[in-house]
């Protein structure tokens, strides 16, 4: 009998991608996050689809339609809680996935890395427009503050902001188009993820040592399908614990009040996963400077392959770079904390120092550490 898995045009693609794919024998649990991100995306699309069936993108009814979903729709509360907390899980996996890439030098697969950065930006855009949809106080004011940053662009800024708003302020037109964007972007993310995988399979996976693993490969199935299934169980466990026991712990209490353009909340802040970038934005007193720093904080990932100075790919055997990497991690956690604090001392100065250290670590200290480690590894006789 002909093996359909290896001959059928469609099954053949799936087979080469997930079944007979040769994978390095030593990849650790840090390589689980790619598949977890795929699952997160599927969860978000499915729950989002069911939410879209009951949601209305009108300023007068958006807030009450979300309340209606939670109160009157069968399991609507569960669908909404899974969708809202699923976004948090998505970003948690994303940050760990990017961190893994930096630690093990995966950014040297330039095409895969660049598509990954575009994916990160697209997911951030999707999450931002999605946060506006419930039309609560923080949704409205978050949208107002962040879209207003466009007006910092010289000459065309104000026109651009009004073009995005569809008027002279965030209003009905803005909400309608944000809903349209929030619906279409996940499908663009799916397409980008396929391209991401396509480029990854051109080179094969990296591994913890950073050494070419061609001499020791194993089939993806059953070894890594089982390993991914374990990660998936942990993901579901954490997501269900969040969604069922503490669904609002990562949200903002201001979003329990309908949007009111006449009443500004005392402290405007985005969701937790944007706080590090928000802290960098706020650390610069100049509006345009802040916007540029905000963009640079993400786009800096694109130049990482060119900042790699070490002779070894992975940080596994590079203790100085490892130390700097964990300082960077601690620094990002500090920035996340600062982003959620009011604009007053000592938070202002801590935010400015942490922002400066963020760029200093990536642009100067880590490349220097690579050169230093090269020097230390040279034979001295």
From Swiss-Prot:
GO cellular component: mitochondrial inner membrane; respiratory chain complex III
Annotated binding of heme b b566, by residue: 97, 196
Molecular function terms from GO: metal ion binding; ubiquinol-cytochrome-c reductase activity
Binding locations of a ubiquinone: 201
InterPro entries xrefs: Cyt_b/b6_C (IPR005798), Cyt_b/b6_C_sf (IPR036150), Cyt_b/b6_N (IPR005797), Cytb/b6-like_sf (IPR027387), Cytochrome_b (IPR030689), Cytochrome_b_C_euk/bac (IPR048260), Cytochrome_b_N_euk/bac (IPR048259), Di-haem_cyt_TM (IPR016174)
Membrane topology: Multi-pass membrane protein
Any matching Pfam family: Cytochrom_B_C
Keyword line: Electron transport, Heme, Iron, Membrane, Metal-binding, Mitochondrion, Mitochondrion inner membrane, Respiratory chain, Transmembrane, Transmembrane helix, Transport, Ubiquinone
Cell location: Mitochondrion inner membrane
Residues reported to bind heme b b562: 83, 182
Record note on cofactor: Binds 2 heme b groups non-covalently.
Membrane-spanning segments: 33-53, 77-98, 113-133, 178-198, 226-246, 288-308, 320-340, 347-367
Cofactor(s) needed: heme b
Domain of life of the native organism: Eukaryota
Additional facts recorded: Heme 1 (or BL or b562) is low-potential and absorbs at about 562 nm, and heme 2 (or BH or b566) is high-potential and absorbs at about 566 nm.
Subunit structure: The cytochrome bc1 complex contains 11 subunits: 3 respiratory subunits (MT-CYB, CYC1 and UQCRFS1), 2 core proteins (UQCRC1 and UQCRC2) and 6 low-molecular weight proteins (UQCRH/QCR6, UQCRB/QCR7, UQCRQ/QCR8, UQCR10/QCR9, UQCR11/QCR10 and a cleavage product of UQCRFS1). This cytochrome bc1 complex then forms a dimer.
Job description of the protein: Component of the ubiquinol-cytochrome c reductase complex (complex III or cytochrome b-c1 complex) that is part of the mitochondrial respiratory chain. The b-c1 complex mediates electron transfer from ubiquinol to cytochrome c. Contributes to the generation of a proton gradient across the mitochondrial membrane that is then used for ATP synthesis.
Family membership noted in the UniProt record: Belongs to the cytochrome b family.
Protein name: Cytochrome b
Gene label: MT-CYB
